[in-house]
């Protein structure tokens, strides 16, 4: 019975062009990467626009060397959870450095390191979203925030995308003793940024707290790459900030930055933190090298290059999208969605690009709402202007000739 049910579900996914398949990367994460299907005899060299390595640090020699040094110092694994014997000097130093970064934005800030961003989000929402609390969740939040809200014992209310007025009304009507606003900062499939200054004003008006997942902003936004709070110049003890260390930081893991009382509560009550083996100390050691690059002059240069590439890509894609009846999302970040609507069209465009040696993922429901299938184009600071021109050129060839004539 189980196998029959699963086969029917697989057939339904296939009929709706929703089947997902893994690919194998044969070389390091970089704009130019050798990739192949699981059963391919040899990988294909591809220009990739689908990783989240926004700062190009996953293959940075300093970070790679630090990872090796960390393994020599601390071994391959931690051996236990943080509360048993797995909390190493490398973990402690990483948390101290991140606390320094967030001291200007969260009074009495401390940080807590997690193995993954998913675990960090689950930990925060389940530890704070207890019975009697209410979570006010953005409709386009990441799946990990959605799942965390489902597992929390709190009441859950949803507000429309970036709609501060609707959130204001929900908060005003709530009698909950603990109100928690839950939002992405940079939305992972759209690239736009939550109105955090407005949300903070609402939090202060209604005595609420803000859980903000800055997975796609940390390392990229702000003069020093410290993320969305630095970029917007915000400071409040009401922020419970979650940053990812496997995207712009180029390694792995995540962290929570919050008032020290909140962090101490998580250490003692957050089950995803307590009941799992700590990440290898070598990873934390490598992240120290990554943070130094992000905050230093090289990081500033990389962010400047990334911002120029974003502008170049949007300038090239805007007329193509208009001609083809597609939508170029309103994004000023490294996540650039080209929304085509139909699932099959998104897959066909992705296949067309791959035939020309370019890899861009086709994103379909349930990851995005029905009717908004898209190419999710992501840029890295280590892409070049020529890389972007090549992508735009291939997409231009994919626009139907009749659409080009109508646009002309």
From Swiss-Prot:
What is this enzyme's EC? 2.3.1.47
UniProt keyword Transferase, yes or no: yes
> How is the subunit organization of this protein annotated in UniProt?
Homodimer.
* MF (Gene Ontology): 8-amino-7-oxononanoate synthase activity; pyridoxal phosphate binding
Q: What does this protein do?
A: Catalyzes the decarboxylative condensation of pimeloyl-[acyl-carrier protein] and L-alanine to produce 8-amino-7-oxononanoate (AON), [acyl-carrier protein], and carbon dioxide.
* Pfam families reported in the protein's UniProt record: Aminotran_1_2
- Please give the InterPro entries that the UniProt record associates with this protein: Aminotransferase_I/II_large (IPR004839), AON_synthase_class-II (IPR050087), AONS_Archaea/Proteobacteria (IPR004723), AONS_Proteobacteria (IPR022834), PyrdxlP-dep_Trfase (IPR015424), PyrdxlP-dep_Trfase_major (IPR015421), PyrdxlP-dep_Trfase_small (IPR015422)
Annotated binding of pyridoxal 5'-phosphate, by residue: 117-118, 188, 216, 244
Q: Which residues carry this modification: N6-(pyridoxal phosphate)lysine?
A: 247
Q: Does the keyword Disulfide bond apply?
A: no
The family annotation for this protein states: Belongs to the class-II pyridoxal-phosphate-dependent aminotransferase family. BioF subfamily.
Q: What is this protein called?
A: 8-amino-7-oxononanoate synthase
Which pathway does it take part in? Cofactor biosynthesis; biotin biosynthesis
Cysteine pairs bridged by disulfides in the record: none
Q: Which gene encodes it?
A: bioF
Lineage, highest ranks first = Bacteria, Pseudomonadati, Pseudomonadota, Betaproteobacteria, Burkholderiales
Q: What class of enzyme is it?
A: transferase
- Name the cofactor(s) required for activity, per the record: pyridoxal 5'-phosphate
Q: Which reaction does it catalyse?
A: 6-carboxyhexanoyl-[ACP] + L-alanine + H(+) = (8S)-8-amino-7-oxononanoate + holo-[ACP] + CO2
- Source organism superkingdom: Bacteria
Q: Which residues does the record give as substrate binding sites?
A: 20, 142, 367
């Amino acid at each position: 019975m189980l196998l029959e049910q699963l086969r029917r579900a697989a057939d339904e996914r296939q009929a709706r062009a929703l089947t997902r398949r893994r690919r194998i990367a044969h070389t390091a994460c970089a704009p130019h990467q050798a990739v192949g299907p699981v059963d391919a005899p040899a990988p294909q060299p591809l220009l990739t626009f689908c990783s989240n390595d926004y700062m190009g640090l996953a293959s940075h020699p300093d970070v790679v060397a630090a990872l090796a040094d960390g393994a020599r110092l601390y071994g391959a694994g931690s051996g236990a959870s943080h509360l048993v014997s797995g909390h190493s000097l490398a973990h402690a130093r990483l948390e101290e450095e991140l606390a320094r970064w967030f001291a200007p934005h969260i009074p009495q800030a401390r940080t807590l390191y997690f193995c993954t961003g998913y675990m960090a989000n689950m930990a925060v929402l389940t530890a704070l979203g207890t019975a009697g609390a209410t979570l006010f969740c953005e409709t386009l939040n990441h799946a990990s925030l959605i799942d965390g809200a489902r597992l929390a014992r709190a009441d859950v209310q949803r507000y429309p995308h970036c709609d501060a007025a609707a959130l204001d009304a929900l908060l005003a009507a709530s009698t909950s003793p603990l109100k928690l606003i839950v939002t992405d900062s940079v939305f992972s499939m759209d690239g736009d940024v939550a109105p955090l200054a407005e949300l903070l004003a609402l939090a202060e008006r209604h005595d609420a707290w803000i859980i903000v997942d800055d997975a796609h902003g940390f390392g990229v936004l702000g003069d020093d790459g410290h993320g969305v709070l630095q970029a917007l110049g915000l400071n409040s003890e009401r922020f419970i900030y979650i940053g990812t260390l496997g995207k712009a930081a180029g390694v792995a893991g995540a962290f929570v930055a919050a008032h020290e009382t909140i962090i101490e509560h998580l250490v003692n009550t957050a089950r995803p933190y307590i009941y799992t083996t700590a990440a290898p100390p070598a990873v934390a050691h490598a992240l120290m090298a990554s943070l130094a690059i992000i905050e230093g002059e090289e990081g500033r240069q990389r962010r400047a290059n990334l911002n120029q590439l974003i502008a170049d890509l949007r300038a090239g894609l805007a007329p193509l999208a208009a001609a083809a009846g597609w939508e170029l999302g309103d994004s000023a970040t490294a996540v650039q969605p080209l929304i085509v609507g139909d699932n099959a069209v998104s897959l066909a465009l992705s296949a067309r690009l791959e035939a020309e040696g370019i890899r861009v993922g086709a994103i379909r429901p349930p990851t995005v709402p029905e009717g908004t299938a898209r190419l999710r184009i992501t840029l890295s600071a280590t892409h070049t202007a020529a890389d972007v021109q090549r992508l735009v050129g291939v997409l231009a060839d994919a626009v139907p000739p009749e659409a080009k004539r109508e646009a002309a």
